[in-house]
C-alpha cells in the first residue's frame, strides 16, 4: 500500500551490485559538512548506495546544538531507512519516535474545525480522475481519508500490520535520530569534530578543500549540509537566492518542547492556524515538539511570544520556557549543484514545515543525485539536476500556498493571504472548486498530486457539490463511483477493526 505520491521510485534496489569506480585509484571521496538531520541522511545514503567505492567524511562541530523542534516526516523517510538498513522500530525504541499517518489541519477556516490530510489513497488505482472522492463529497460522506478513515485518526489508533503493508511514516526527535544514524555507520564513515570556517577553490571555481579550526579536508565532491548557515554555498560564485516570501511570508519560529505524560499519543502532526501564522505540534514518545511560526510583517516578536505563551497555558497547562526565536528565509538557491559542490536540506532552501517537505527533499535529492552520478561531473547532469530541484520547490510552494486559500479574512495576515493570492493559486482554486483534478494535472514526479489538492479543497469546504454531481453524471460513472465508495468503506472498516491504540502499539515494540 505504498503511496504513489509521497515516495519516488529509486531505480537501484537493495542487493544490487555496487557501482564500479570509473577510475582505478582510491575510492571517490565525498566530504559532507554538517552533522544534523540532513548531514546524517546524506552521508549514510552515499555509503549505503556505493559501499566501498566511496569514502565519506563527515565534518561538523559536535558541540553545536541542532534546532531540535521535532521532525514531522513523510513516507519518504521509510524509503531512506530501507536504503540504509535501519528498521523504523529502532527509532521508536531508541529515539522517542512515534507513528505518523498524516496531518491534522486545525482552525484553518477560522471556526475551530479541523480536517485531515493523510498520506496514501487506496482508491488511487481507480481514483486517478477523482471519481470516488467526488461521489463522497456530493453525498456528504467523504472523510478525507481514503486509506484508514477518520475514526482511526480521531481515536489515535494504528493498524497492527502497519510496518508490513501500511502507508505511514514517523515523527522523530531530529537530534537523537541524527546521532543514532551516524553511530550506526561510525565504522563506515570518517566522522570529524571540527568547525569549518572557509574553503579553497581551484582556477575553475571547484572546491579543493574545506578549512576548519583543526585541519584542512580535501575531497572529490563536497556537500553543504550546514543548515541556515549555507556555509559552503555562500562562498560559491554565480548563484542566486530565489526569495519566495511574497508567496509564504512567515519568517520566524518560536520553538518550545512540551514535556508531559501522554494519555494518548496522536497519530498525526497538528498544524493549528492562529490569527497571524500557525502552531506546529509534533507528538514524540516523551514530549510534544511545538513551534509557533509567524511573520514579522504582521506581528512583532514580543506579540508572538505573548500569544504563544497564552496558547500553551490554555492548551497544555504550561508556560513558554524561553524567548528563543529562530529566523528563517523562505526561498531556495536557483542552482543547488555547482561544480563539485551540492547543497542539501536547509542549506539548499527552506519551506515552512506545514507538510514536512524539508527532510523529504533531502532524500529526494539523494535519490536523484545517486541515480545520475557516476563519479564524473558533467554539466548536462548539473543542469538537469538543478531543473528538477527547481521544479520540486515550485510544486511545494504551490501546494503550501494553496493550503492558505481558505478564505479567512479575520486579521491583516489572513487578509493578505486571501486577497493577495498569486495568479497560479487563483486559477487552481477556480478549477478545483468546480471540477476535480486528475493524474494528468501535474508531472508524474510531482511531490503533491491531484488527490492532495482535492483533500485540502474539501477540508476548506470549497468543493461545489452541484458541479461535481453533474460531472459524475455526464461521464456516466455515478454507479461505478458508488460501488467503489462502498467497497472502500468496507475495507476501511476492516482496517479499523485490526487497529489498536497508538500508545499501546508503541509499547509492544
Regions from the language model: what does each represent?
Residues 28-54:
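N-terminal Rossmann-like FAD-binding beta1-loop-alpha1 element of flavoenzymes
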Residues 47-69:
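Glycine-rich FAD pyrophosphate-binding loop
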Residues 65-154:
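Dinucleotide-binding Rossmann-like beta1-alpha1 core, especially the glycine-rich loop
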Residues 114-180, 184-185, 193, 225, ...:
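Low-complexity, highly charged intrinsically disordered N-terminal segments
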Residues 166-304, 366:
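Predominantly flavin-linked oxidoreductase catalytic cores and closely associated redox partners
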Residues 274-327, 349-360, 375-378:
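Conserved FAD/dinucleotide-binding core of flavoprotein oxidoreductases
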Residues 331-396:
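Conserved mid-domain beta->alpha element of the FAD-binding
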Residues 371-509:
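Long, low-complexity C-terminal extensions of enzymes
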Amino acid at each position: 500500500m505504498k503511496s504513489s505520491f509521497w515516495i519516488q521510485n529509486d531505480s537501484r534496489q537493495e542487493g544490487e551490485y555496487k557501482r564500479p569506480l570509473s577510475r582505478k585509484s582510491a575510492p571517490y571521496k565525498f566530504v559532507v559538512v554538517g552533522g544534523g538531520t540532513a548531514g546524517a541522511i546524506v552521508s549514510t545514503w552515499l555509503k549505503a548506495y556505493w559501499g566501498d567505492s566511496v569514502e565519506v567524511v563527515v565534518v561538523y562541530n559536535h558541540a553545536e546544538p541542532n534546532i531540535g523542534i521535532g521532525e514531522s516526516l513523510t513516507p519518504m523517510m521509510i524509503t531512506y531507512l530501507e536504503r540504509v538498513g535501519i528498521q523504523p522500530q529502532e527509532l521508536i525504541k531508541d529515539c522517542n519516535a512515534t507513528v505518523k499517518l498524516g496531518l491534522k489541519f486545525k482552525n484553518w477556516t477560522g471556526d475551530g474545525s479541523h480536517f485531515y490530510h493523510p498520506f496514501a489513497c487506496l482508491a488511487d488505482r481507480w481514483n486517478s480522475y477523482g471519481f470516488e472522492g467526488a461521489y463522497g463529497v456530493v453525498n456528504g460522506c467523504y472523510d478525507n481519508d481514503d486509506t484508514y478513515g477518520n475514526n482511526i485518526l480521531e481515536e489515535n489508533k494504528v493498524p497492527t500490520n502497519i510496518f508490513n503493508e501500511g502507508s505511514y511514516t514517523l515523527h522523530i526527535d531530529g537530534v537523537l535520530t541524527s546521532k543514532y544514524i551516524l553511530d550506526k555507520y561510525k565504522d563506515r564513515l570518517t566522522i570529524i569534530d571540527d568547525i569549518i570556517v572557509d574553503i579553497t577553490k581551484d582556477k575553475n571555481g571547484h572546491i579543493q578543500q574545506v578549512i576548519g579550526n583543526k585541519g584542512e579536508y580535501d575531497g572529490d565532491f563536497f556537500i553543504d549540509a550546514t543548515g541556515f548557515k549555507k556555509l559552503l554555498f555562500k562562498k560559491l560564485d554565480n548563484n542566486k537566492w530565489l526569495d519566495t516570501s511574497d508567496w509564504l511570508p512567515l519568517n520566524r519560529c518560536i520553538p518550545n518542547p512540551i514535556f508531559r505524560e501522554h494519555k494518548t499519543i496522536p497519530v498525526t502532526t497538528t498544524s493549528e492556524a492562529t490569527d497571524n501564522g500557525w502552531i506546529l505540534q509534533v507528538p514524540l514518545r516523551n514530549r510534544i515538539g511545538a513551534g509557533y511560526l509567524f511573520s514579522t510583517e504582521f506581528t512583532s516578536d514580543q506579540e508572538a511570544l505573548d500569544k504563544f505563551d497564552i496558547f500553551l497555558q490554555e492548551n497544555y497547562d504550561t508556560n513558554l520556557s524561553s524567548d528563543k526565536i529562530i529566523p528563517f528565509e523562505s526561498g531556495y538557491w536557483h542552482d543547488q549543484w555547482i561544480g563539485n559542490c551540492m547543497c542539501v536540506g536547509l542549506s539548499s532552501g527552506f519551506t515552512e514545515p506545514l507538510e514536512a517537505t524539508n527532510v523529504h527533499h533531502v532524500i529526494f535529492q539523494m535519490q536523484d543525485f545517486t541515480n545520475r552520478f557516476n563519479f564524473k561531473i558533467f554539466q548536462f547532469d548539473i543542469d538537469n539536476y538543478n531543473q528538477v530541484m527547481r521544479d520540486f520547490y515550485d510544486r511545494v510552494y504551490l501546494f503550501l500556498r494553496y493550503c492558505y486559500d481558505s478564505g479567512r479574512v479575520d486579521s491583516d495576515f489572513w487578509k493578505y493571504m486571501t486577497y493577495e493570492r498569486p495568479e497560479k493559486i487563483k486559477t487552481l482554486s477556480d478549477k478545483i472548486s468546480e471540477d476535480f483534478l486528475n493524474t494528468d494535472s501535474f508531472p508524474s514526479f510531482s511531490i503533491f498530486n491531484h488527490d492532495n489538492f482535492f483533500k485540502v479543497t474539501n477540508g476548506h469546504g470549497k468543493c461545489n457539490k452541484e458541479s461535481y454531481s453533474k460531472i459524475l453524471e455526464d461521464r456516466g460513472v455515478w454507479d461505478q463511483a458508488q460501488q467503489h465508495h462502498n467497497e472502500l468503506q468496507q475495507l476501511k472498516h476492516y482496517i479499523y477493526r485490526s487497529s489498536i491504540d497508538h500508545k499501546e502499539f508503541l509499547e509492544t515494540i
